[in-house]
Amino acid sequence: IQKTELELQNARKRIYYISLLRLILFVGAVANAIIFWSDGWLCLSAFAILPFILFIWLVKRHNFWFYRKDFLKKKIEINEQELRAMQYDFSDFDDGKEFVNPSHLYTLDLDVFGEHSLFQYINRTATPIGKQHLASWFNAHLENKEAIEHRQEAIHELSTDLEYRQQIRLLGLLYKGKPADTTEIKEWANSPSYYRKRTLLRILPTAVTIINFLCIGLAILGIISASIAGGVFVGFVLFSTIFSKGITKLQTTYGEKLQILSTYADQILLTEQKEMQSHILQKLKTELTSQNQTASQAVRQLSKLMNALDQRSNLLISTILNGLIFWELRQVMRIEKWKEIHASDLPRWIETIGEIDAYCSLATFAYNHPDYIYPTIAAQSFHLQAEALGHPLMDRNKCVRNGIDIERRPFFIIITGANMAGKSTYLRTVGVNYLLACIGAPVWAKRMEIYPARLVTSLRTSDSLADNESYFFAELKRLKLIIDKLEAGEELFIILDEILKGTNSMDKQKGSFALIKQFMHMNTNGIIATHDLLLGTLVDSFPQNIRNYCFEADITNNELTFSYQMRNGVAQNMNACFLMKKMGIAVIND
């Protein structure tokens, strides 16, 4: 950060000195033009026109250093954000709240999207399409060993290139775009050409240019009067206004949105210049191809064409150029020609950069956690084994890490324990790390090996007034969904917290026994947390397929303490009555 701040100070100094030089040159050029006006073109050129040319060059340098200043400010900002994120303040990053879906198989239960979510912790995307790609990976994790391993390779490769990742992010952040922009750009790329389809309109700019310069030449030679040449010019100016409405519509609808193309061009150029090693990144790089030029050159060409069209807002220049060469129509023709050549390329390039942007987010996550490991992915037979699993969003100085061992199919872990002892946190820890493993990201564990079955959870089912749906019915719907998927032959990894919470104790117990037995017969795997200690007796019926673990609450010297360490067996201590007494609520024993 200190090095970048020094560069920023240097950029600000250059901007100041260039501003001063521009002012001196402008004043000097005007003064020289007045002084040497009567001394002929040679003196005028030397003392007035040349300073104007130098002034224009300085304007370009000024723009460069303004961009450099913004770039450096943004670089300092993102590094400060990363420092805050190391202290578990990741409020600077987009939380993806628009992706929250209460009916999703696991994202709501695991706090994947929304405020203080896993997505917000990991998300470093700088393009709208990159954010959508990253969200889609969280919404639909991979279930194939080879696909996960290829993604692991790509993430690991990018995690070692901090400069590339920061450049991709910085370039994206300098453009203030909206998610809809890329969608509308794709719509424009796939829309038919209007002007180039009409032969008369195609030849019109050339014809107007020839007629104008012919009239100017004839006027100089004295064959026709200057007023005739001027009349022709004015006529063409008026004629050009016929096309203004359609061109204005194109400019207002897509012009601002296409400004993002300069960002994509820079990001594409960076990627073209980078040597890729992993299978996925090499494949993505091959998508950035074009017919006779590089993808970055093609995108930059379109960006320049759109910027040139934007100059029509300068009425004086646009009036002169339209009258002389039908400049606006000529520019639109060039833009449509570009579209005809690259209509199928542009959406592919945008998608590719978005995907690379998403990979950079996961690579930054890996870079920020050098002690995290990439899990081993098993090809056959479900099992899940891990040592020292921790939740990524928990303070590493306070997090108590636990393991898991599901060694065969079917197999269920039943977890019992007191309130606040750590059951629900453990379920989310397993679920989040399982999800990270299945999207190819590193996990917080000493060792982890998984078979990637589809994850399904039921941890925080809620009622719905809008759908006239009770809490209990909502939970039954989720359980029915799980059963339907199993009957359809899908392989699942199931995580449930307190089954059938919305009914009475006896009914709940009976239903829980029946559900777990059904899971056994359907050959599936998972974890169930419960307060019902009798569920622990199921191990007698399925000694090879069920294992009991617990989180205990210890009462010492009239104080409640938690170790948050998972132990073998069924919980022995409960704490509800103790907590009620501590809060002054009378507990009467019969």
Positions of predicted regions on the chain:
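ATPase nucleotide-binding head domains, primarily ABC-like/P-loop NTPase cores
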Residues: 58-59, 243, 362, 368-590
